[in-house]
Curated annotation (Swiss-Prot):
<feature type="region of interest" description="Disordered">
    <location>
        <begin position="1"/>
        <end position="20"/>
    </location>
</feature>
<dbReference type="GO" id="GO:0036524">
    <property type="term" value="F:protein deglycase activity"/>
</dbReference>
<dbReference type="InterPro" id="IPR029062">
    <property type="entry name" value="Class_I_gatase-like"/>
</dbReference>
<dbReference type="InterPro" id="IPR050325">
    <property type="entry name" value="Prot/Nucl_acid_deglycase"/>
</dbReference>
<dbReference type="Pfam" id="PF01965">
    <property type="entry name" value="DJ-1_PfpI"/>
</dbReference>
<feature type="active site" description="Nucleophile">
    <location>
        <position position="188"/>
    </location>
</feature>
<protein>
    <recommendedName>
        <fullName>Protein/nucleic acid deglycase HchA</fullName>
        <ecNumber>3.1.2.-</ecNumber>
        <ecNumber>3.5.1.-</ecNumber>
        <ecNumber>3.5.1.124</ecNumber>
    </recommendedName>
</protein>
<feature type="compositionally biased region" description="Basic and acidic residues">
    <location>
        <begin position="1"/>
        <end position="18"/>
    </location>
</feature>
<keyword id="KW-0963">Cytoplasm</keyword>
<keyword id="KW-0227">DNA damage</keyword>
<keyword id="KW-0378">Hydrolase</keyword>
<dbReference type="GO" id="GO:0005737">
    <property type="term" value="C:cytoplasm"/>
</dbReference>
<dbReference type="GO" id="GO:0030091">
    <property type="term" value="P:protein repair"/>
</dbReference>
<keyword id="KW-0234">DNA repair</keyword>
<dbReference type="GO" id="GO:0019243">
    <property type="term" value="P:methylglyoxal catabolic process to D-lactate via S-lactoyl-glutathione"/>
</dbReference>
<dbReference type="GO" id="GO:0006281">
    <property type="term" value="P:DNA repair"/>
</dbReference>
<comment type="similarity">
    <text>Belongs to the peptidase C56 family. HchA subfamily.</text>
</comment>
Length: 291
């Protein structure tokens, strides 16, 4: 039976930071679950060629909101770990990097505690999540013609907004991956990373102009996410709005688990797309590299 604690729409204080808040109990009851929709990862002929996927995680937990509160966030564990599970099973191992080299911050309140696939891949990569590489330190290798990476993966969670969209290192990496025909995989708020190539550039030179993507809808961040107490205040800026200003075309209106591929860019709309995006990414990379 629900109690007052489960139905409160008031964000929960995070006492590790001044005026910081986790999502409300009610919002977590609506947005999280003990298991995902994972339904298997069958890749009978996994890749054995040695190319890896570079996962860029967020190293910042707190987002300063417009009302002065801090949203205690990070990367969403399902959005990170389910795509990783599929790609790992398909034969593509991961390197993990953050902008600073500090640990990846996860929204542990969204971890599906009864999902064995998610738990197993989390355990496998936990050492790398706790001690990632600094992106700048591996950038030269990552953008080289003989790069060890088949793709870059930027998972979602509101924590992505903290630094990744403004990073010159991310800008250089994404531009190089576009130029060298490598894959970019991202979902939910992760497509905020696609703003990095616009840093210090003219809008008309934006490389993702006219690309079609799936991304978490701004309408939920300005509506339901505030109404149910998922966030303690309005975001400082909106992902979709800023991408659309640069000419990106957003396909989804809501969150249904929709995924999309446009050229070498693979995107998903929300945590609900995690399993679908993992399947799409694994299939795509196997077709491209398992030859």
């Amino acid at each position: 039976m629900s109690n007052e604690r489960d139905t409160s729409r008031t964000p929960t204080p995070d006492h590790a930071e001044h005026n910081a808040f986790f999502p409300s109990p009610y919002s977590l009851s609506q947005y999280t679950s003990a298991k995902t929709d994972f339904d298997g990862a069958d890749y009978p002929t996994p890749y054995k060629g040695g190319k890896k996927v570079l996962m860029i995680g967020t190293d910042e937990r707190y987002i300063l909101m417009q009302n002065g509160s801090m949203f205690s966030t990070g990367n969403h564990p399902v959005e990170m770990l389910l795509p990783m599970y599929h790609l790992d099973k398909a034969g593509f191992e991961f390197d993990v990097a953050t902008l600073s080299g500090n640990p990846v911050k996860l929204e542990m309140w969204a971890m599906p505690g009864e999902d064995e696939a998610v738990k197993s891949i989390y355990a496998k990569y936990l050492p790398k999540l706790k001690a990632p590489q600094k992106l700048a330190d591996l950038l030269e290798q990552a953008v080289a013609d003989d790069s060890p990476y088949a793709a870059v993966f930027v998972p979602g969670g509101h924590g992505v907004l903290a630094g990744i969209p403004h990073s010159r290192e991310v800008k250089r990496l994404l531009n190089a991956f576009l130029a060298k025909d490598r894959y970019i995989i991202t979902l939910c708020h992760g497509p905020a990373c696609l703003l990095a190539p616009a840093v210090e550039e003219k809008p008309e030179d934006y490389p993702f102009k006219d690309y079609e993507i799936c991304v978490f809808p701004d309408a939920l961040d300005t509506g339901a996410n505030l109404e149910i107490g998922y966030m303690p205040g309005p975001l400082p800026w909106l992902v979709g709005e800023n991408l659309q200003k640069l000419g990106v075309k957003i396909l989804n209106k809501g969150i249904t688990g929709q995924v999309h591929r446009d050229r070498k860019l693979l995107t998903g709309d929300s945590p609900l797309a995690s399993n679908n995006l993992g399947k799409l990414a694994a299939k795509t990379l196997l077709e491209a590299f398992a030859r």
